[in-house]
């Protein structure tokens, strides 16, 4: 896998210990990670479908297939929220893409479990969720037995050449810091920022524990200022979010 594709999984589950098997320059499709916001996307309640996201993903896939950079590339789509969205997308694929192309491109649409141990050159992730209310959605944590973290970990690491994160959310206002969905969206919008910020944290940290705390808070979406000066003293770090600040001594 390319470094950029294992970056999110490294951050989420492996404490940055996985080493990439391919060089970053070995893919001919750029950018390697794309965030695509469906501004009118809406989850249809208990059905756990987002028809506009489904339509957008199929339209993007068809557009890719027409470009020379994607000649011979295989495609996959992963729903991050249940099998009803899988059916919604699969129906559109069957309707809008020629069956010969479906076979030639080895198109697979499913959930994370369907892609365990499998890959495609180009992967589209459908987040499904939307927010029609004021204020952020309830926090999505790792789930019982780490189920959600495992789901996201697999989904974000199935692409060989390009990963699309297709969502209907404004990560800044619709999601809380630490929410799995926010972490994935933020990563997809600027994957290099995470590795760059981690290097800065490593330089400023005065102990391994302080480094681990600062990295975890940053990964969860907090703005971290290390070695905060207060008069003649220094605080290990201050975590900032909106109008709130918390001082942390390690």
State the predicted function of each range.
Residues 238-247:
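Active-site beta-strand-loop-beta-strand hairpin of nuclease catalytic cores
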Residues 118-130, 137, 163-164:
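A short beta-strand element within the Helicase C-terminal
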Residues 126-128, 247-250:
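Active-site ExK catalytic segment of metal-dependent nucleases
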Residues 80-82, 109-115:
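Conserved helicase motor
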Residues 31-33, 105, 119-122, 159-163:
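Short glycine-/polar-rich loops that comprise or flank the Walker A/P-loop
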């Amino acid at each position: 896998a390319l470094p950029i594709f294992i970056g999110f999984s490294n951050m989420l589950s492996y404490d940055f210990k996985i080493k990439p098997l391919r060089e970053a320059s070995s893919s001919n499709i750029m950018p390697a990670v794309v965030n695509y916001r469906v501004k009118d996307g809406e989850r249809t309640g208990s059905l756990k479908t987002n028809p506009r996201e489904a339509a957008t993903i199929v339209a993007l896939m068809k557009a890719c297939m027409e470009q020379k950079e994607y000649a011979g590339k295989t495609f996959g789509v992963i729903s991050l929220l249940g099998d009803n969205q899988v059916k919604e997308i699969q129906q559109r694929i069957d309707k809008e893409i020629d069956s010969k192309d479906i076979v030639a491109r080895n198109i697979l649409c499913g959930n994370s479990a369907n892609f365990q141990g499998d890959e495609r050159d180009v992967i589209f992730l459908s987040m499904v969720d939307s927010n029609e209310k004021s204020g952020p959605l309830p926090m999505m944590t790792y789930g019982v037995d780490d189920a959600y973290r495992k789901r996201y970990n697999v989904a974000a690491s199935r692409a060989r050449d390009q990963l699309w994160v297709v969502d209907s959310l404004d990560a800044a206002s619709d999601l809380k810091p630490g929410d799995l969905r926010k972490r994935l969206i933020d990563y997809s919008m600027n994957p290099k920022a995470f590795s760059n910020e981690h290097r800065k944290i490593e330089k400023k940290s005065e102990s391994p524990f302080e480094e681990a705390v600062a990295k975890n808070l940053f990964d969860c979406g907090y703005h971290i200022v290390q070695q905060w000066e207060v008069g003649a003293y220094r605080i290990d770090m201050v975590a900032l979010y909106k109008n709130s600040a918390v001082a942390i001594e390690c």
